[in-house]
Amino acid sequence: MATHALEIAGLFLGGVGMVGTVAVTVMPQWRVSAFIENNIVVFENFWEGLWMNCVRQANIRMQCKIYDSLLALSPDLQAARGLMCAASVMSFLAFMMAILGMKCTRCTGDNEKVKAHILLTAGIIFIITGMVVLIPVSWVANAIIRDFYNSIVNVAQKRELGEALYLGWTTALVLIVGGALFCCVFCCNEKSSSYRYSIPSHRTTQKSYHTGKKSPSVYSRSQYV
Protein backbone atom coordinates (compact mmCIF):
# COMPACT_ATOMS: atom_id res chain seq x y z
CA MET A 1 0.00 0.00 0.00
CA ALA A 2 2.87 2.36 0.81
CA THR A 3 4.58 1.67 -2.52
CA HIS A 4 1.32 2.36 -4.35
CA ALA A 5 1.09 5.77 -2.66
CA LEU A 6 4.71 6.48 -3.60
CA GLU A 7 3.93 5.56 -7.22
CA ILE A 8 0.97 7.95 -7.33
CA ALA A 9 3.00 10.75 -5.74
CA GLY A 10 5.92 10.17 -8.09
CA LEU A 11 3.67 10.13 -11.15
CA PHE A 12 1.95 13.34 -10.02
CA LEU A 13 5.25 15.13 -9.41
CA GLY A 14 6.62 13.81 -12.70
CA GLY A 15 3.58 15.14 -14.56
CA VAL A 16 3.88 18.52 -12.87
CA GLY A 17 7.58 18.59 -13.69
CA MET A 18 6.90 17.74 -17.33
CA VAL A 19 4.36 20.57 -17.67
CA GLY A 20 6.71 22.93 -15.84
CA THR A 21 9.59 22.03 -18.16
CA VAL A 22 7.54 22.83 -21.25
CA ALA A 23 6.29 26.05 -19.65
CA VAL A 24 9.80 27.22 -18.79
CA THR A 25 10.93 26.43 -22.34
CA VAL A 26 8.27 28.58 -24.02
CA MET A 27 8.04 31.44 -21.49
CA PRO A 28 9.65 34.73 -22.60
CA GLN A 29 10.37 35.93 -19.05
CA TRP A 30 13.91 34.63 -18.72
CA ARG A 31 15.36 38.13 -18.58
CA VAL A 32 13.25 41.13 -17.62
CA SER A 33 13.95 44.84 -17.38
CA ALA A 34 15.79 46.10 -14.30
CA PHE A 35 14.31 49.35 -13.02
CA ILE A 36 17.28 51.00 -11.32
CA GLU A 37 18.84 54.46 -11.23
CA ASN A 38 17.74 56.43 -14.30
CA ASN A 39 15.60 53.53 -15.45
CA ILE A 40 13.21 53.71 -12.49
CA VAL A 41 10.48 55.45 -14.48
CA VAL A 42 8.74 52.71 -16.40
CA PHE A 43 8.51 53.67 -20.06
CA GLU A 44 9.46 50.31 -21.57
CA ASN A 45 9.38 46.81 -20.21
CA PHE A 46 11.56 44.19 -21.92
CA TRP A 47 11.25 40.42 -21.73
CA GLU A 48 13.83 38.11 -23.26
CA GLY A 49 13.19 34.39 -23.68
CA LEU A 50 14.53 31.44 -25.60
CA TRP A 51 12.32 31.94 -28.63
CA MET A 52 11.18 35.57 -28.60
CA ASN A 53 11.57 38.95 -26.97
CA CYS A 54 8.70 41.15 -25.90
CA VAL A 55 8.41 44.91 -25.44
CA ARG A 56 5.64 46.78 -23.68
CA GLN A 57 5.58 50.56 -23.78
CA ALA A 58 3.43 52.90 -21.73
CA ASN A 59 -0.27 52.69 -22.67
CA ILE A 60 0.58 50.15 -25.41
CA ARG A 61 -0.04 46.43 -25.17
CA MET A 62 2.92 44.09 -25.23
CA GLN A 63 4.40 43.18 -28.59
CA CYS A 64 6.45 40.01 -29.03
CA LYS A 65 8.78 39.09 -31.86
CA ILE A 66 10.36 35.72 -32.60
CA TYR A 67 14.12 35.77 -33.05
CA ASP A 68 15.14 35.92 -36.70
CA SER A 69 18.20 33.74 -36.12
CA LEU A 70 19.70 31.56 -33.42
CA LEU A 71 22.78 33.77 -33.56
CA ALA A 72 20.69 36.65 -32.22
CA LEU A 73 20.75 34.94 -28.83
CA SER A 74 23.53 35.23 -26.31
CA PRO A 75 25.62 32.06 -25.77
CA ASP A 76 23.89 31.21 -22.50
CA LEU A 77 20.43 31.46 -24.06
CA GLN A 78 21.56 29.40 -27.07
CA ALA A 79 22.71 26.61 -24.77
CA ALA A 80 19.57 26.99 -22.67
CA ARG A 81 17.35 26.52 -25.72
CA GLY A 82 19.00 23.22 -26.64
CA LEU A 83 19.07 21.90 -23.08
CA MET A 84 15.46 22.84 -22.37
CA CYS A 85 14.26 21.18 -25.59
CA ALA A 86 16.12 18.02 -24.58
CA ALA A 87 14.66 18.24 -21.08
CA SER A 88 11.12 18.53 -22.48
CA VAL A 89 11.57 15.36 -24.54
CA MET A 90 13.19 13.49 -21.64
CA SER A 91 10.44 14.45 -19.20
CA PHE A 92 7.77 13.22 -21.63
CA LEU A 93 9.55 9.89 -22.14
CA ALA A 94 10.01 9.45 -18.40
CA PHE A 95 6.34 10.22 -17.75
CA MET A 96 5.18 7.66 -20.33
CA MET A 97 7.55 5.04 -18.89
CA ALA A 98 6.24 5.78 -15.40
CA ILE A 99 2.69 5.14 -16.58
CA LEU A 100 3.74 1.80 -18.08
CA GLY A 101 5.47 0.84 -14.83
CA MET A 102 2.50 1.51 -12.56
CA LYS A 103 0.99 -1.53 -10.86
CA CYS A 104 -2.48 -0.57 -12.10
CA THR A 105 -1.29 -0.66 -15.73
CA ARG A 106 -2.03 -3.94 -17.54
CA CYS A 107 -0.44 -3.34 -20.93
CA THR A 108 2.98 -4.43 -19.62
CA GLY A 109 1.64 -7.60 -18.02
CA ASP A 110 1.55 -8.60 -14.35
CA ASN A 111 5.27 -9.11 -13.83
CA GLU A 112 6.01 -6.84 -10.88
CA LYS A 113 9.76 -7.19 -11.31
CA VAL A 114 9.62 -5.84 -14.87
CA LYS A 115 7.39 -2.96 -13.78
CA ALA A 116 9.75 -2.14 -10.94
CA HIS A 117 12.67 -1.86 -13.34
CA ILE A 118 10.57 0.33 -15.67
CA LEU A 119 9.78 2.64 -12.75
CA LEU A 120 13.45 2.72 -11.78
CA THR A 121 14.40 3.76 -15.32
CA ALA A 122 11.69 6.44 -15.32
CA GLY A 123 12.93 7.72 -11.96
CA ILE A 124 16.52 7.96 -13.16
CA ILE A 125 15.42 9.84 -16.29
CA PHE A 126 13.36 12.23 -14.16
CA ILE A 127 16.38 12.96 -11.96
CA ILE A 128 18.61 13.51 -15.00
CA THR A 129 15.95 15.78 -16.51
CA GLY A 130 15.86 17.83 -13.32
CA MET A 131 19.61 18.31 -13.53
CA VAL A 132 19.33 19.24 -17.22
CA VAL A 133 16.73 21.90 -16.34
CA LEU A 134 18.83 23.18 -13.45
CA ILE A 135 21.94 23.77 -15.57
CA PRO A 136 20.61 26.35 -18.09
CA VAL A 137 18.43 28.11 -15.52
CA SER A 138 21.36 28.59 -13.14
CA TRP A 139 23.67 29.52 -16.02
CA VAL A 140 21.39 32.30 -17.28
CA ALA A 141 20.78 33.52 -13.72
CA ASN A 142 24.52 33.72 -13.10
CA ALA A 143 25.01 35.74 -16.31
CA ILE A 144 22.22 38.14 -15.32
CA ILE A 145 23.64 38.70 -11.84
CA ARG A 146 27.17 39.15 -13.18
CA ASP A 147 26.05 41.79 -15.70
CA PHE A 148 23.85 43.48 -13.11
CA TYR A 149 26.81 44.22 -10.85
CA ASN A 150 29.17 45.00 -13.73
CA SER A 151 29.78 48.75 -13.83
CA ILE A 152 30.81 48.60 -17.49
CA VAL A 153 27.36 47.40 -18.63
CA ASN A 154 24.94 50.20 -19.43
CA VAL A 155 22.06 50.60 -16.98
CA ALA A 156 19.49 50.30 -19.77
CA GLN A 157 20.97 46.92 -20.76
CA LYS A 158 20.92 45.42 -17.29
CA ARG A 159 18.33 42.75 -16.62
CA GLU A 160 16.78 41.01 -13.63
CA LEU A 161 15.79 37.40 -13.01
CA GLY A 162 12.53 36.61 -14.75
CA GLU A 163 9.65 34.40 -13.65
CA ALA A 164 10.80 31.60 -15.94
CA LEU A 165 13.98 31.16 -13.90
CA TYR A 166 12.12 30.80 -10.62
CA LEU A 167 9.72 28.36 -12.24
CA GLY A 168 12.72 26.48 -13.65
CA TRP A 169 14.29 26.01 -10.22
CA THR A 170 10.97 24.79 -8.83
CA THR A 171 10.49 22.44 -11.77
CA ALA A 172 13.97 20.98 -11.36
CA LEU A 173 13.29 20.26 -7.68
CA VAL A 174 9.93 18.65 -8.47
CA LEU A 175 11.49 16.41 -11.14
CA ILE A 176 14.30 15.28 -8.85
CA VAL A 177 11.90 14.52 -5.98
CA GLY A 178 9.54 12.64 -8.31
CA GLY A 179 12.41 10.56 -9.67
CA ALA A 180 13.65 9.84 -6.15
CA LEU A 181 10.20 8.53 -5.19
CA PHE A 182 10.27 6.05 -8.08
CA CYS A 183 13.72 4.90 -6.97
CA CYS A 184 12.32 4.39 -3.46
CA VAL A 185 9.51 2.28 -4.92
CA PHE A 186 12.07 0.06 -6.63
CA CYS A 187 14.06 -0.35 -3.39
CA CYS A 188 10.90 -1.21 -1.44
CA ASN A 189 9.90 -3.81 -4.02
CA GLU A 190 13.36 -5.36 -3.92
CA LYS A 191 13.28 -5.60 -0.13
CA SER A 192 9.80 -7.13 -0.09
CA SER A 193 10.80 -9.65 -2.77
CA SER A 194 13.91 -10.74 -0.87
CA TYR A 195 11.89 -11.06 2.34
CA ARG A 196 9.19 -13.04 0.55
CA TYR A 197 11.73 -15.54 -0.79
CA SER A 198 13.63 -15.86 2.47
CA ILE A 199 10.60 -16.99 4.53
CA PRO A 200 9.92 -20.33 2.70
CA SER A 201 13.58 -21.32 2.88
CA HIS A 202 13.57 -20.73 6.63
CA ARG A 203 10.45 -22.83 7.10
CA THR A 204 11.89 -25.59 4.96
CA THR A 205 15.00 -25.63 7.11
CA GLN A 206 12.90 -25.94 10.25
CA LYS A 207 10.85 -28.74 8.73
CA SER A 208 13.91 -30.69 7.68
CA TYR A 209 15.38 -30.17 11.14
CA HIS A 210 12.32 -31.63 12.86
CA THR A 211 12.19 -34.53 10.40
CA GLY A 212 15.82 -35.31 11.00
CA LYS A 213 15.27 -35.14 14.74
CA LYS A 214 12.42 -37.67 14.69
CA SER A 215 14.08 -40.24 12.48
CA PRO A 216 16.62 -41.46 15.07
CA SER A 217 13.80 -42.02 17.53
CA VAL A 218 11.86 -44.22 15.12
CA TYR A 219 14.98 -46.13 14.23
CA SER A 220 15.86 -46.82 17.86
CA ARG A 221 12.38 -48.17 18.65
CA SER A 222 12.45 -50.61 15.76
CA GLN A 223 15.87 -51.70 16.77
CA TYR A 224 14.71 -52.25 20.31
CA VAL A 225 11.78 -54.43 19.21
From Swiss-Prot:
Cellular localization per UniProt: Cell junction, Tight junction; Cell membrane
Q: Name one GO cellular component term.
A: plasma membrane
InterPro entries, per the entry? Claudin, Claudin_CS, PMP22/EMP/MP20/Claudin
Principal location: other
Catalyzes what? chloride(in) = chloride(out); bromide(in) = bromide(out); iodide(out) = iodide(in); fluoride(in) = fluoride(out)
The answer on whether this UniProt entry bears the keyword Amino-acid biosynthesis reads no
Q: Which residues form a coiled coil?
A: none
Record topological domains on the Cytoplasmic side: 1-7, 103-117, 188-225
Q: In which tissues is it expressed?
A: Expressed in the epididymis, mainly in the caput segment.
Q: What is the stated purpose of this protein? A: Can associate with other claudins to regulate tight junction structural and functional strand dynamics. May coassemble with CLDN4 into tight junction strands containing anion-selective channels that convey paracellular chloride permeability in renal collecting ducts. Cannot form tight junction strands on its own.
- Name recorded for this polypeptide: Claudin-8
Organism in which the protein naturally occurs: Homo sapiens (Human)
Gene field: CLDN8
